């Protein structure tokens, strides 16, 4: 449960957004008025951005309460920042055998609810502040012998009660690899094989697979029905030396990942940003 994760983040010395388990309209309104709008509501026991909403007024909250059904929801104050992760395969002592992480520039909640294009990328190297937060979280949760995908907020501005710009907050833990095509992106990003590393962890409690040079690995998902300036052929020609995956996204994943995906590998952030710009341009 998302609410149960909060105490373990506290053990790791990481703040989290203020939260409340929604019971009725009156208590939900009290919490929203205490922290201020917008607030975010999501199932306390759920995956990804399914049934996750940003509420900006009493009217939004009343509409949500009228339609939420019997599911238990957690309500949190809205955090002004972006999501960065610490992903790893850890051994029986909780020590990483492989490390990576991604940045999601836009909220997955907004991508799903507003039907936006989908973007995220694997960083070339995990920043020390995220690595430190990740390792402390691993210790607090007592994680051993598994793949992990730990999510953190990085504040994009000072926020009263939470911290200063650049501070790291706990968001959610996932005792699994990141979803979608990310496991393959790990391999492209570090010229390795995380499937082999995971098997080595299970069988030998160590890694026997070398890890190569590090790169940025960028995902871009386009939506059907949008008229983009560059078509599929033009993208494939322009980025032939960089694109490592492309194709249709299964409909079951299209809410968060869009319909047509391109994954590119780059040595510099500037190259990656140019790739994003070219794929995003539309009429």
Q: Where are each of the predicted segments found?
A:
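Active-site nucleotide/adenylate-binding loops and adjacent lid/helix of ATP-dependent enzymes
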Residues: 1-81, 91-96, 118-132, 277-281
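Short secondary-structure junctions
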Residues: 14, 141-143, 239-241
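Short, flexible turn/loop "capping" segments at secondary-structure junctions
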Residues: 43-45, 111-112, 253-257
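Short acidic/glycine-enriched loop/turn segments that link adjacent beta-strands
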Residues: 48-49, 81-83, 214, 256
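A short secondary-structure junction signal
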Residues: 51-52, 182-185
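Phosphate-binding core of ATP-grasp and ATP-grasp-like enzymes
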Residues: 68-72, 78-120, 127-169, 174-182, ...
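Gly/Ser/Thr-rich active-site loops/lids in small-molecule metabolic enzymes
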Residues: 184-200
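Peripheral (often C-terminal) accessory segments that flank ATP-dependent C-N-forming ligase machineries
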Residues: 197-283
């Amino acid at each position: 449960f998302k609410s149960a994760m909060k105490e373990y983040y506290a053990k790791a010395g990481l703040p989290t957004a203020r939260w409340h388990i929604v019971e009725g309209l009156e208590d939900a309104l009290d919490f929203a008025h205490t922290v201020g709008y917008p607030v975010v509501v999501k199932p306390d026991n759920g995956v990804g951005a399914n049934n996750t909403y940003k509420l900006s007024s009493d009217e939004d909250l009343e509409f949500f309460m009228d339609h939420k059904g019997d599911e238990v929801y957690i309500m949190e104050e809205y955090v002004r920042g972006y999501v960065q992760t610490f992903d790893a395969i850890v051994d029986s002592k909780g020590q990483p055998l492989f490390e990576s992480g991604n940045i999601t520039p836009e909220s997955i909640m907004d991508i799903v609810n507003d039907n936006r294009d989908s973007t995220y990328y694997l960083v070339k190297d995990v920043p020390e502040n995220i690595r430190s937060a990740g390792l402390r979280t691993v210790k607090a949760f007592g994680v051993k012998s598994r793949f992990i995908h730990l999510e953190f907020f990085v504040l994009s501005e000072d926020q009263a009660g939470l911290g200063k710009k650049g501070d790291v907050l706990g968001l959610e833990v996932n005792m699994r690899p990141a979803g979608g095509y990310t496991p393959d992106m790990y391999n492209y990003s570090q010229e390795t094989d995380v499937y082999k590393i995971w098997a080595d962890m299970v069988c030998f409690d160590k890694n026997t697979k070398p890890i190569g040079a590090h790169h940025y690995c960028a995902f871009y998902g386009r939506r059907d029905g949008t008229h983009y300036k560059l078509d599929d052929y033009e993208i494939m020609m322009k980025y032939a030396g960089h694109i490592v995956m492309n194709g249709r996204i299964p409909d079951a994943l299209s809410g968060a990942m869009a319909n047509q995906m391109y994954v590119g590998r780059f040595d510099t952030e500037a190259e990656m940003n140019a790739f994003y710009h070219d794929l995003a341009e539309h009429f």
